[in-house]
């Protein structure tokens, strides 16, 4: 076999071992080279049998980088100091609201009074937590407090002295003269009066049909039945 290079002066013992070939072992012919079947398809890349270990280590490094808010710097005199990575906003004063039996009090520097100061409610003090996460119990208390405030305001407002049923009856100002039934609009009353008078002013537009209806929507619905039969 023709070799492009001369291996006569090559020290075989100094050559690195290849997979399946132990540094040629002084063999000069290709026919004497034998590769084991087990190592025939092996690659030079390492096998990651513990891939989850590598993945966990990578996650740890990423989390450490993401939540590390300081970095180390050197000053002019050679001393090392830690400085924040991100811009830190000033610590704003949180506003706490306390509900008692008398009034609603706001703990803030502002001297303005809210319109809700006249409302009353029985509840505990609601403050914003330090971590910004509101628990389910605190959320339910806030929701119940808002609902009770709204209900109490509706009850104390003189304009909302009527109940829902009384309010609906008040809005039904169009009364039928025959059956004394009330309606909220004059159109509904006129449509209802056709039941007593028997008026059927809407004729079916289909040729040959003599059906008449008191309501326009019923007439159109009947007309569509003719169109479906003709298809």
Swiss-Prot record:
GO BP, one annotated term: single-species surface biofilm formation
UniProtKB keywords: DNA-binding, Metal-binding, Nucleus, Phosphoprotein, Repeat, Repressor, Transcription, Transcription regulation, Zinc, Zinc-finger
Annotated disulfide bonds: none
Keyword Transmembrane helix listed: no
Mapped zinc finger ranges (C2H2-type): 174-196, 202-226
Signal peptide: none
Subcellular compartments: Nucleus
Keyword Methyltransferase set for record: no
Matches recorded under SUPFAM superfamilies: beta-beta-alpha zinc fingers (SSF57667)
One Gene Ontology MF term: DNA-binding transcription factor activity, RNA polymerase II-specific
SMART domains: ZnF_C2H2 (SM00355)
GO CC annotation terms, alphabetical: chromatin; nucleus; transcription regulator complex
Function description: Transcriptional repressor involved in regulation of glucose repression. Binds to UAS-1 in the STA1 promoter.
Miscellaneous: Present with 556 molecules/cell in log phase SD medium.
Name of the molecule in the record: Transcriptional regulator NRG1
Native source species: Saccharomyces cerevisiae (strain ATCC 204508 / S288c)
């Amino acid at each position: 076999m023709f070799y492009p290079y001369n291996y006569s002066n090559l020290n075989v013992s100094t050559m690195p071992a290849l997979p399946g070939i132990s540094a040629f072992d002084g063999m000069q012919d290709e026919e004497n080279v034998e590769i084991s079947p087990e190592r025939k398809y092996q690659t030079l890349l390492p096998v990651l049998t513990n891939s989850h270990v590598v993945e966990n280590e990578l996650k740890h490094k990423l989390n450490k980088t993401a939540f590390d808010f300081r970095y180390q710097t050197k000053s002019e005199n050679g001393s090392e100091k830690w400085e924040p990575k991100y811009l830190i906003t000033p610590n704003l004063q949180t506003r706490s609201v306390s509900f008692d039996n008398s009034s609603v009090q706001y703990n803030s520097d502002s001297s303005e009074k809210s319109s809700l100061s006249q409302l009353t409610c029985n509840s505990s003090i609601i403050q914003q937590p330090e971590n910004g996460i509101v628990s389910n119990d605190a959320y339910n208390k806030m929701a119940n407090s808002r609902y009770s405030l709204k209900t109490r305001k509706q009850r104390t407002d003189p304009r909302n002295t009527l109940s829902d049923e009384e309010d609906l009856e008040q809005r039904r100002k169009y009364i039928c003269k025959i059956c004394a039934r009330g309606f909220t609009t004059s159109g509904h009353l006129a449509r209802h009066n056709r039941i007593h008078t028997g008026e059927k002013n809407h004729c079916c537009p289909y040729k040959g049909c003599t059906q008449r209806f008191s309501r326009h929507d019923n007439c159109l619905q009947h007309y569509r039945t003719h169109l479906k039969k003709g298809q």
